[in-house]
From Swiss-Prot:
Transmembrane segments: none annotated. Residues 146-160 have a biased composition (Acidic residues). Essential cofactor of the RNA polymerase L that plays a central role in the transcription and replication by forming the polymerase complex with RNA polymerase L and recruiting L to the genomic N-RNA template for RNA synthesis. Also plays a central role in the encapsidation of nascent RNA chains by forming the encapsidation complex with the nucleocapsid protein N (N-P complex). Acts as a chaperone for newly synthesized free N protein, so-called N0, allowing encapsidation of nascent RNA chains during replication. The modification Phosphoserine is found at S86, S151. The keyword Coiled coil does not apply. Belongs to the morbillivirus P protein family. Residues 1-48 are annotated as: Interaction with N0. Residues 134-145, 260-270 have a biased composition (Low complexity). The N-terminus consists of a long intrinsically disordered tail. The central part contains the coiled-coil multimerization domain (MD). Forms a four-stranded coiled coil structure. The C-terminus constitutes the alpha-helical domain (XD) that binds to the nucleocapsid (N-RNA complex). Residues 41-99, 134-163, 201-231, 250-273 are annotated as: Disordered. The gene is P/V. It comes from Measles virus (strain Edmonston-AIK-C vaccine) (MeV). This is Phosphoprotein.
Length: 507
């Protein structure tokens, strides 16, 4: 099969080169077109011509070129033509004899016949013919030569398995596929096909036959259909189109009343619903409703995934909404998880605050028991409160162990030292601090908490500037006093300036 295909391709290329080298004359083309129109207008004459070819007659009223067979030399020849008739038939077409081999392939055509011999119209491309299974009632494609010279197996030769082998091209095809794929069947498939043909014996004649479906009705095809296959030689769209489905979703259309009387007993039709042209969705059938299930609903029950367009869109909308809800739920769950983490952190913060409160309470308790040291010396003798006795309850040392602290810092009175041997001896004299723990007296010529005494140091000038800035004097006077302070030199002048400044502020 592959060798035949390669030979056909080679012959076609040679014909194309010959046509380019020596084009066919316009007169020959017109005569060929006239012959083709006569064949199309007179199918009976075409059938008679092909029957004469099958019977082996040497004369042809109209040439019928083969689309399948080829000569041993590689060039296509005219069907039913003898060895010496090529020149006469070439002269009938108006083609020069020397260019017949090169130009005859340009006039090739395909003929498809059924079993009755009727020509099938509308076939433009043999590759687009879909082959169906079956032995009876199918049309056949007749295109073989009488001599079976291209057959690989002789007619009637017994097979190794015991089956009568006929021509390879006469085997019926058991599965539907294109005519161009017929030649790819090899090996066991060929033997199986030949075995089925030998058992059938339903073909009236031998030869290369193919089971093909009847040509489709162009009137029933959808006008908006797009071609599903392009031509191979002329690059024209074939007859195959996508036919729109005639099934419509909805309720069953009403049936017209039959004029004939029913032969059998009638059935009540009181619960028949009113007629509707179409319905978007058919509910499940119930005996009370009287509605019928459409074929599409039955297909759904059988397992086919067929949905009405509107129902399918509704389902898609529901799926989209569910996906959106699921996404929102995931976001809410993530936020709740973050809230749970924050709740744990808040609990830990509360625990830390409680521990800090406990620590603060402990410090408050400690501060309540701390002894405050108030020195009894260092006061100004002119102060009227200098002779006031210090509260004996105020301890002069910071500490919690008052007994140990007092024993370390207080010196015992003389009376207590004299009465050490007396167990019940008590004295009214108070204890006094040791000299190393007694504060030194405050000097009158040094700055202290009692009063400010200016000196030549920068700290004294800074204190005076602060006094000027914090006073309620006018800004002009403040600036004037600042300039005077910068011009003063010496400790005595600075002390006088300080006394003058205090008098101005106190006014």
């Amino acid at each position: 099969m592959a060798e035949e295909q390669a030979r056909h391709v080679k012959n076609g290329l040679e014909c194309i080169r010959a046509l380019k080298a020596e084009p066919i004359g316009s007169l020959a083309i017109e005569e060929a077109m006239a012959a083709w129109s006569e064949i199309s207008d007179n199918p009976g004459q075409e059938r008679a011509t092909c029957r004469e070819e099958k019977a082996g007659s040497s004369g042809l009223s109209k040439p019928c070129l083969s689309a399948i067979g080829s000569t041993e030399g590689g060039a296509p020849r005219i069907r039913g033509q003898g060895p010496g008739e090529s020149d006469d038939d070439a002269e009938t077409l108006g083609i020069p004899p020397r260019n017949l081999q090169a130009s005859s392939t340009g006039l090739q055509c395909y003929y498809v016949y059924d079993h009755s011999g009727e020509a099938v119209k509308g076939i433009q491309d043999a590759d687009s013919i879909m082959v169906q299974s079956g032995l009876d009632g199918d049309s056949t494609l007749s295109g073989g030569d009488n001599e079976s010279e291209n057959s690989d197996v002789d007619i009637g030769e017994p097979d190794t398995e015991g089956y009568a082998i006929t021509d390879r091209g006469s085997a019926p095809i058991s599965m539907g596929f294109r005519a161009s794929d017929v030649e790819t069947a090899e090996g066991g498939e060929i033997h199986e096909l030949l075995r089925l043909q030998s058992r059938g014996n339903n073909f009236p004649k031998l030869g290369k036959t193919l089971n093909v479906p009847p040509p489709p009705d162009p009137g029933r095809a959808s006008t908006s259909g797009t071609p599903i296959k392009k031509g191979t030689e002329r690059r024209l769209a074939s007859f195959g189109t996508e036919i729109a489905s005639l099934l419509t979703g909805g309720a069953t259309q009403c049936a017209r009343k039959s004029p004939s009387e029913p032969s059998g007993p009638g059935a009540p039709a009181g619960n028949v619903p009113e007629y509707v042209s179409n319905a978007a969705l058919i509910q499940e059938w119930t005996p009370e409703s009287g509605t019928t299930i459409s074929p599409r609903s039955q297909n759904n029950e059988e397992g086919g995934d067929y949905y009405d367009d509107e129902l399918f869109s509704d389902v898609q909308d529901i799926k989209t909404a569910l996906a959106k809800i699921h996404e929102d739920n995931q976001k809410i769950i993530s936020k709740l998880e973050s809230l749970l983490l924050l709740k744990g952190e808040v609990e830990s913060i509360k625990k830390q605050i409680n521990r800090q409160n406990i620590s603060i309470s402990t410090l408050e308790g400690h501060l309540s028991s701390i002894m405050i040291a108030i020195p009894g010396l260092g006061k100004d003798p002119n102060d009227p409160t200098a002779d006031v006795e210090i509260n004996p309850d105020l301890k002069p040392i910071i500490g919690r162990d008052s007994g140990r602290a007092l024993a370390e810092v207080l010196k015992k009175p003389v009376a207590s030292r004299q009465l050490q041997g007396m167990t019940n001896g008590r004295t009214s004299s108070r204890g006094q601090l040791l000299k190393e723990f007694q504060p030194k007296p405050i000097g009158k010529k040094m700055s202290s908490a009692v009063g400010f005494v200016p000196d030549t140091g920068p700290a004294s000038r800074s204190v005076i500037r602060s006094i000027i800035k914090s006073s309620r004097l006018e800004e002009d006077r403040k600036r004037y006093l600042m300039t005077l302070l910068d011009d003063i030199k010496g400790a005595n002048d600075l002390a006088k300036f300080h006394q003058m400044l205090m008098k101005i502020i106190m006014k």
